[in-house]
């Protein structure tokens, strides 16, 4: 049975806030939680949630994870709290540090998250920013590990916008030595600084590829992953993106070009007929709802690691 080790970094703002060993330990711990082989009571600790963006899976999975750990959750609505009236982040962070034991924040600007971490005296977790979605990536790689065991056998192809999800997949791929391919239209590549950070870690620089033809990108791949084309806050770009991403739908034709053991991932919500066909979404090779369940287990493990 795996026991939680205190994470060396007090915060989890980026996938790179963990070492490779810590990342693997969190996955192992998550599997123990999933199989109900471990029970940890963090002495009625309190998790504060600050979500500037809509959320279903992240919000609920954090609340359930904290409850299963024996703690409680306080959900701060930015509209009805003083945050919505413009209270400085440094003031909010210092006050919440006296009420809560850990804070999970979903916001637009990554710099705002870093400002919370700067002024907070308790752990801060990135529950999604425009730059990264590291908790999602933890669940993604737990799902991949459950399917393929050895990460060295994995070729992960992400098809779609080079967004926060793609950025976190790249960083985690670098930590674990996984081949990651990002298939996107020109002009929608992942963040350059993220790519450069990943290349500093990758022992084999050729394991990270940016490809503009989705059919080339899926050759030999055994994980096909997609996300919405228009992220939250990009609703005004939807029409343009729908045109630009034509041909980047994961459908049966694309799946046939991948490995025979390929699985399908999607971080949800999904728009059938856009980034993924309804047929593939509901197919036997889809692991989408297993992936969604794993959000709960990895976040329970993450909270245990930060609070232990």
Swiss-Prot record:
Disulfide bonds: none annotated. Pathway: Amino-acid biosynthesis; L-arginine biosynthesis; L-arginine from L-ornithine and carbamoyl phosphate: step 1/3. It is found in: Cytoplasm. It catalyses: carbamoyl phosphate + L-ornithine = L-citrulline + phosphate + H(+). Keywords: Amino-acid biosynthesis, Arginine biosynthesis, Cytoplasm, Transferase. Carbamoyl phosphate binds at residues 55-58, 82, 106, 133-136, 267-268, 295. The keyword Cytoplasm applies. L-ornithine binds at residues 164, 227, 231-232. PROSITE patterns: CARBAMOYLTRANSFERASE (PS00097). Its EC number is 2.1.3.3. GO terms for cellular component: cytoplasm. Its main location: cytoplasm. GO terms for molecular function: amino acid binding; ornithine carbamoyltransferase activity. InterPro entries: Asp/Orn_carbamoyltranf_P-bd, Asp/Orn_carbamoylTrfase, Asp/Orn_carbamoylTrfase_sf, Asp_carbamoyltransf_Asp/Orn-bd, Orn/put_carbamltrans, OTCase_ArgI. It comes from the Bacteria. GO terms for biological process: arginine biosynthetic process via ornithine; citrulline biosynthetic process; L-arginine biosynthetic process. Belongs to the aspartate/ornithine carbamoyltransferase superfamily. OTCase family. PANTHER family: ORNITHINE CARBAMOYLTRANSFERASE, MITOCHONDRIAL (PTHR45753), ORNITHINE TRANSCARBAMYLASE, MITOCHONDRIAL (PTHR45753:SF3). Reversibly catalyzes the transfer of the carbamoyl group from carbamoyl phosphate (CP) to the N(epsilon) atom of ornithine (ORN) to produce L-citrulline. This is Ornithine carbamoyltransferase. It comes from Prochlorococcus marinus (strain MIT 9312). The gene is argF.
């Amino acid at each position: 049975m795996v026991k939680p080790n205190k994470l060396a970094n007090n915060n989890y703002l980026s996938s790179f806030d963990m070492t490779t060993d810590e990342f693997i330990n969190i996955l192992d711990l998550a599997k123990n939680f999933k199989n109900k082989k471990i029970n940890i009571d963090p002495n009625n600790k309190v998790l504060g949630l600050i979500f500037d963006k809509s959320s279903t899976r992240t919000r609920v999975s954090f609340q359930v994870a904290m409850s299963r750990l024996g703690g409680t959750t306080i959900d701060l609505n930015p509209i009805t709290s003083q945050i919505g009236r413009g209270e400085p982040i440094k003031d909010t962070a210092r006050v919440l540090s006296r009420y809560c034991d850990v804070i999970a924040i979903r916001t637009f600007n990554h710099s705002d998250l870093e400002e919370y971490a700067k002024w907070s005296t308790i752990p801060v977790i990135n529950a999604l920013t425009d730059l990264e979605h590291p908790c999602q990536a933890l669940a993604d790689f737990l799902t991949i590990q459950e399917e393929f065991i050895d990460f060295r056998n994995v070729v992960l192809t992400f098809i779609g916008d080079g967004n926060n999800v793609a950025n976190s997949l790249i960083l985690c791929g670098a930590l674990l030595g996984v081949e990651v391919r990002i298939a996107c239209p020109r002009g929608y590549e992942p963040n350059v600084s993220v790519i450069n950070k990943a290349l500093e870690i990758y022992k084999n620089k050729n394991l990270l590829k940016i490809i503009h033809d989705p059919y080339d990108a899926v050759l030999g791949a055994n994980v096909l992953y997609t996300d919405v084309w228009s992220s939250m806050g990009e609703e005004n770009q939807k029409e343009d993106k729908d045109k630009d991403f034509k041909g980047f739908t994961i459908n049966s034709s694309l799946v046939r070009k991948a490995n025979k053991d390929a699985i399908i991932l999607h971080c949800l919500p999904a728009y059938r007929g856009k980034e993924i066909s309804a047929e593939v979404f509901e197919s036997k090779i889809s692991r989408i709802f297993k992936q969604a369940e794993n959000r709960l287990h990895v976040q329970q493990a993450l909270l245990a690691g930060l609070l232990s």
